[in-house]
Amino acid sequence: MAHKKAGGSSRNGRDSAGRRLGVKKFGGESVIGGNIIIRQRGTKVYAGRNVGMGKDHTLFATAEGRVVFHKGKLGRSYVSVDALPLAAE
């Protein structure tokens, strides 16, 4: 009798899509309030002036201006937004 042994099932073969993390706005770029600057896991970079942090540690601009990266105490990296001066009417 012609029989074929059943093939074994593989336990591999799964993968998840990349999470699209990283810097979205680099130093010197212009941003407006609400623009995402960095998507990260944990606090690789901390929020400086005019930057807020979401519950998933996403850093976003809270004011219009230019993005600036700098080092702070304990060697921590910070990102700030140098706000544009308000135009006089």
Curated annotation (Swiss-Prot):
GO terms for molecular function: structural constituent of ribosome. Keywords: Ribonucleoprotein, Ribosomal protein. Pfam families: Ribosomal_L27. The keyword Isomerase does not apply. Residues 1-20 are annotated as: Disordered. GO terms for biological process: translation. SUPFAM superfamilies: Ribosomal L27 protein-like. InterPro entries: Ribosomal_bL27, Ribosomal_bL27_CS. Signal peptide: none annotated. One of its GO terms (cellular component) is cytosolic large ribosomal subunit. Belongs to the bacterial ribosomal protein bL27 family. This is Large ribosomal subunit protein bL27. The gene is rpmA.
